[in-house]
Amino acid sequence: MAKYNIVISGYYGFHNAGDEAMLLAILQALRKTFDAPSITVISGNPSDTARTFGVKAVPRFGMLPILSSLFRTDLLISGGGSLLQDVTSWKSMIYYLTIIIVGVLFRKQVFLYSQGIGPVRYRIIRIILKHVLNHVDAITVRDSESKGFLQRLGVHRTIYTTADAVLSLD
């Protein structure tokens, strides 16, 4: 049986304890769910991420390695954390949305995992967010405010509210 290929996109490889714990929680869940999955993480420090978590890793701004990984993957996971907000930076929001858009265009399964969504100040970004998220396969958010925001935005996919993935760590 072929290995199940998974790409994880998030704010990984920057030694942020919360984000690294989120990645660990996602990896634990995936390894319980799939038999020996092949996992690639998009990372700010690929060698450190690969060594620490026992995964493949590609550089955060290496477009060719990212595109190649997304082309070969079965599933793209975007999360967790508060990636889809433009208060910190509208550029980071566009970055994460672009990864999701490529996954959708490549016809991959795309899963938003344990996300905190918003706030989104810019109207054009809200429009893009609505259209992109109406094409993903699954959405889980970590709070009712994020769910309400997406519903008011016009995202018609089923949105599940779940605890922050870090709470599931073994």
Tell me the role of every PLM-derived stretch.
Residues 1-170:
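Active-site anion-handling motifs in enzyme catalytic cores
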